[in-house]
Amino acid sequence: MATGTVKWFNDAKGFGFITQDGGGEDVFCHHSAINMDGFRTLQEGQKVEFEVTRGPKGLQAQNVRSIP
């Protein structure tokens, strides 16, 4: 599992990007990859844990969850 910080997330469009703690390419995050009940969203600056996969347009986050 990778960790990072939410760079930005657009609720209206349902996606955003996560900056990895280890550096490297920012990771795309779609709302469907967020593990939480109710409305799936992330806040700028929020710390998260996630799996990284390579999608057709670059790195994608899967199984995203908030960490303290």
UniProtKB/Swiss-Prot annotation:
GO terms for cellular component: cytoplasm. Gene3D superfamilies: 6.20.370.130, Nucleic acid-binding proteins (2.40.50.140). The keyword Cytoplasm applies. Keywords: Activator, Cytoplasm, DNA-binding, Transcription, Transcription regulation. Pfam families: CSD. GO terms for molecular function: DNA binding. It comes from the Bacteria. Residues 4-64 form the CSD domain. It is found in: Cytoplasm. The keyword Iron does not apply. This is Cold shock-like protein CspA.
